[in-house]
Amino acid sequence: MDFRANLQRQVKPKTLSEEERKVHGPQQVDFRSVLAKKGTPKTPVPEKVPPPKPATPDFRSVLGSKKKLPTENGSNNTEALNAKAAEGLKPVGNAQPSGFLKPVGNAKLADTPKPLSSTKPAETPKPLGNVKPAETPKPLGSTKPAETPKPLGSTKPAETPKPLGNVKPAETPKPLGNIKPTETPKPLGSTKPAETPKPLGSTKPAETPKPLGNVKPAETPKPLGNVKPAETPKPLGNVKPAETPKPVSNAKPAETLKPVGNAKPAETPKPLSNVKPAETPKLVGNAKPAETSKPLDNAKPAEAPKPLGNAKPAEIPKPTGKEELKKEIKNDVNCKKGHAGATDSEKRPESRGTAPTFEEKLQDLHVAEGQKLLLQCRVSSDPPATITWTLNGKTLKTTKFIVLSQEGSLCSVSIEKALPEDRGLYKCVAKNSAGQAESSCQVTVDVPDAPTSENAKAPEMKARRPKSSLPPVLGTESDATVKKKPAPKTPPKAAMPPQIIQFPEDQKVRAGESVELFGKVAGTQPITCTWMKFRKQIQDSEHIKVENSEQGSKLTIRAARQEHCGCYTLLVENKLGSRQAQVNLTVVDKPDPPAGTPCASDIRSSSLTLSWYGSSYDGGSAVQSYSVEIWDSVDKTWKELATCRSTSFNVQDLLPDREYKFRVRAINVYGTSEPSQESELTALGEKPEEEPKDEVEVSDDDEKEPEVDYRTVTVNTEQKVSDFYDIEERLGSGKFGQVFRLVEKKTGKIWAGKFFKAYSAKEKENIRQEISIMNCLHHPKLVQCVDAFEEKANIVMVLEIVSGGELFERIIDEDFELTERECIKYMKQISEGVEYIHKQGIVHLDLKPENIMCVNKTGTRIKLIDFGLARRLENAGSLKVLFGTPEFVAPEVINYEPIGYATDMWSIGVICYILVSGLSPFMGDNDNETLANVTSATWDFDDEAFDEISDDAKDFISNLLKKDMKNRLNCTQCLQHPWLMKDTKNMEAKKLSKDRMKKYMARRKWQKTGNAVRAIGRLSSMAMISGLSGRKSSTGSPTSPLNAEKLESEDVSQAFLEAVAEEKPHVKPYFSKTIRDLEVVEGSAARFDCKIEGYPDPEVVWFKDDQSIRESRHFQIDYDEDGNCSLIISDVCGDDDAKYTCKAVNSLGEATCTAELIVETMEEGEGEGGEEEEEE
């Protein structure tokens, strides 16, 4: 048959039944397919044959053109060779088993092997089979003796040729292969590749040749077949020794032995490929390749050669003893050392070389989808190793998507555009005859939204690469699949999310100094850098400049001022994620001058009391003291009189014949302020009764104005309030607690003690937040907190006492004369107090008549109280609240829109409207009607009460009661409004009717005592907002609302009223939205969001692997008024890979939800993955 077609298909082992093998037994089969199965390297395309090596010339062209190949002695006549067959050639089966027989194996070629047929006439070998003497078999080929083994038929004629079969020892037969005459050739069996025997025609001389059969080396060398050495040598065809030896081929005895190259394709096997025609050896006889020597032509020198007799049973029918032959092929090894038949090469174990080792191992890699994936490692071995790449246990091959490259010792896998299917465990296996080694790494392919995406299982890998239909070839796969491509000089960097690798700490600078905030970034470009303050992006301006580059971003403030104080955030983003860092900037300076004009009171013959306001801005550091300066009409120079800590001072030893002026400076650690405005010229010795009534606003008939030290208060948990104060009568009570009169034991000063009921940690935290805000509000128009104590279920705030009662109660008093002039004085003080609050970045959010207190019962001085609902706007961004009193609350609060400083201005407008008219602009018959009036902003001046009110007053009110908060006046504009700038001393004092005010106050009192006032929670009945609560603290939890409990009807009983709210039904905590699993890249930010329902408002605690989390710059917890709670983890690292739990607790129970954070680390791991199972 023509077996050339077999070159294009793979031989499948064990596919023919025994009957089929018998039918095909006489046929000659292409044995090159068998060689390919046992280690012959494959080419990338089976049809493509690698270029010939010099040592293995292609002889196919000779088969087509030259009929006969001349031998080295010049004779090209095969008949002459056959003529002497009777003298020298012995039958295969008659050879002696004593060891003189040289099997047809692959031996070293240092000496020129003898040809099979080109010898002297007396030594001409006989044909191996039953061949007619007239014909002579062709030689197997001729190769260079110094490099590769020579063919069986191309040797010098002077030496005795070796027959293919077993010949008698008298002639010292030569083996079929190229063997040195002095060395014992190996039998024709197949040996383990670890011995690195070389094929018949192309092996290195230094390697041990393989025998033609599977024969144990310690025994007598076996002939071409698998024959036991102790018995009569078997022929090439696995024949029992007792029988007549069979010829090498399965040709009939009557037929003539035909050479390999000169026979017709149907009868003769095709020649070996990749061999030069001049050196092509001829097969001796029509022997079956499976049972005779196989030509090992296409094997690389470094790879295991294939024995001559290992044909696959699917193609080659086997004679008797097939099962035994299979066992021998699998188990037999080369000849044992020391045996007479062993070669010198076998006795040198060091010839095996060194096992592969990885000088540079594979490293774990992160790449972004669509970017280049490159894995590299460096392998050293001798002989060179076979490289195999696998992904998740599947062998990789070169495709148009994947390039496998090997440049010397550098091996690489390159994928131009990585896809999710390319992630997984990559393994590189290096294998040679001396052993094998492997290295592995994990590759992750990230999608662009990986930092914020929720955790999901990796999608199944789609089969992007074409699957090969060819079975793997063990040991030689890389030769067929690896393209050799020079590795790039510098491997591309793996894609990385942005990193802020350098960032300044919190800074404190002096006013006027320049500030540079620089954040150094790293990561995959492009990286976008944005500076923000109060969650608003900072743009270049006259004083601020932002400069961005690939190295980072710099924010420069040329001359720092007060408005530049705050928290600055640098946000860096790229397509792989984002990261942010914060720095607090404090601009410190000497304080602003004390506000307003110092005022003299209690003027006597040689003394007076001087009072003044605190600084509107303390310069970033608390005011430590005040310096009082005096000027008299004689010296006419300013001198420092004294230094004190409070905002009042009793001036003594004044001379009656002089006039005096005073001014005050504020002092902090950074310096002394400019002087305040000068007081009016004051003379002594005047009659006290002639003192102007103007002094009424700063004096009290019974006692001096209490001197208040501005203190930064911390809650004292070690001592009790009774240790420092005597607790006297109760001044008032409410659901929040009670108010008592306190007398300080040390000084005898009178204070008000507000005793809060605080059973839970959240309630205590709410009160601490109020104290913290009051520490920032040191101003004469704001009530001061001077001390605080925490006891078991109570927190006590020691407050400056204001004994004049509520403003509106003071107005309707019978001895009080209400004019527009008094209204101006009150509104001016309210505006001054709120202006200071706003300058500190705080909104009051509960401005109403109950929270405006008169200092005494006779004057017009007032103070603002109750900062329990106050909020910081500095770092709150878009703040929304859901509390207030319906009559005074702004529309944006009801509509649950972002609030601002203008929210307080609306309340000021409502207070002013009521103050001048005694009417409420929005009060309805019920809360729903009131809230509807507020949201529609419907009001007017049509009532006759406004007939007596000036146009300036109406304009003032109109500019505050604007529905759009952007159009409302701010406090500074209010103080500059013509109405508040009027000269109250000289203006007309027209009395206003107090009847409407009395009716209004009666209604308000009925509402408070008759359980009629409700919080914004009633909006739910209007289908506008649901779940709105009453008073809440700055952390978003409501305080206890006031119930119908009536307050004491004492003069100061209205002094500390809570926001009135309707009781909500109590509900156990539950999560209307739970946190979900996250998967983020290291260095980015992670955010868990949930929404918590329940009343009383639950306390929230976050846990990381059952350990509670404390808020820090790394862990930030947000909990707003609507129950939305978030945990933000900035700059995520591997340690953050954990289970996170949010726990909500109130008095009715608790609820939890849990999620997992998976962090894809960017660090390059050196550890190798687990070993894969051995490939079959």
From Swiss-Prot:
It comes from Bos taurus (Bovine). Gene3D superfamilies: Immunoglobulins, Phosphorylase Kinase, domain 1, Transferase(Phosphotransferase) domain 1. The modification Phosphothreonine is found at residue 1039. Belongs to the protein kinase superfamily. CAMK Ser/Thr protein kinase family. Its EC number is 2.7.11.18. Residues 26-41, 972-1035 are annotated as: Calmodulin-binding. PANTHER family: IMMUNOGLOBULIN, MYOSIN LIGHT CHAIN KINASE, SMOOTH MUSCLE. The keyword Calcium applies. SMART domains: FN3 (SM00060), IG (SM00409), IGc2 (SM00408), S_TKc (SM00220). Residues 319-721 are annotated as: Actin-binding (calcium/calmodulin-insensitive). One of its GO terms (molecular function) is actin binding. Residues 1-41 are annotated as: Actin-binding (calcium/calmodulin-sensitive). This is Myosin light chain kinase, smooth muscle. Calcium/calmodulin-dependent myosin light chain kinase implicated in smooth muscle contraction via phosphorylation of myosin light chains (MLC). Also regulates actin-myosin interaction through a non-kinase activity. Phosphorylates PTK2B/PYK2 and myosin light-chains. Involved in the inflammatory response (e.g. apoptosis, vascular permeability, leukocyte diapedesis), cell motility and morphology, airway hyperreactivity and other activities relevant to asthma. Required for tonic airway smooth muscle contraction that is necessary for physiological and asthmatic airway resistance. Its main location: cytoplasm. The active site is at residue 846. Residues 594-686 form the Fibronectin type-III domain. It comes from the Eukaryota. All isoforms including Telokin bind calmodulin. Interacts with SVIL. Interacts with CTTN; this interaction is reduced during thrombin-induced endothelial cell (EC) contraction but is promoted by the barrier-protective agonist sphingosine 1-phosphate (S1P) within lamellipodia. A complex made of ABL1, CTTN and MYLK regulates cortical actin-based cytoskeletal rearrangement critical to sphingosine 1-phosphate (S1P)-mediated endothelial cell (EC) barrier enhancement. Binds to NAA10/ARD1 and PTK2B/PYK2. The modification Phosphotyrosine is found at residues 710, 836, 896. Residues 725-980 form the Protein kinase domain. Residues 43-55 have a biased composition (Pro residues).
